[in-house]
Amino acid sequence: MAVPQFHRPSTVTTDSVRALGMRGLVLATNNSQFIMDNNHPHPQGTQGAVREFLRGQAAALTDLGLAHANNTFTPQPMFAGDAPAAWLRPAFGLRRTYSPFVVREPSTPGTP
């Protein structure tokens, strides 16, 4: 598989970008040149080349994540286990940000 040359959009495919890996992708992107001529157009136009690049980049990130899955912390639950006052909190958003008590403005003496 040929290495994609970003100044030649016709060489950009999802599989060629994915095969670079993340390190190779960053190096190839940093070393890329401007498109000086239109002698190598992508079959689906510039947007097609961009789409192929993004798909290949996403696939390379997925491969990187899978390759290092054993070297990362296990995902942790966002909320603590069953809290005694869970019934007081709304069932959406970040539960820890809501007080389990009803919050009211302090009343000033002499006002209704």
Curated annotation (Swiss-Prot):
The keyword Transport does not apply. It is found in: Virion; Host nucleus. One of its GO terms (cellular component) is viral capsid. Its main location: virion. Keywords: Capsid protein, Host nucleus, Host-virus interaction, Virion. Interacts with the major capsid protein/MCP. Interacts with host TSPAN7; this interaction may be responsible for the presence of TSPAN7 in extracellular virions. Interacts with host MAPRE3 and DYNLT1; these interactions mediate retrograde transport of viral capsids. This is Small capsomere-interacting protein. The lineage of its organism: Viruses, Duplodnaviria, Heunggongvirae, Peploviricota, Herviviricetes.
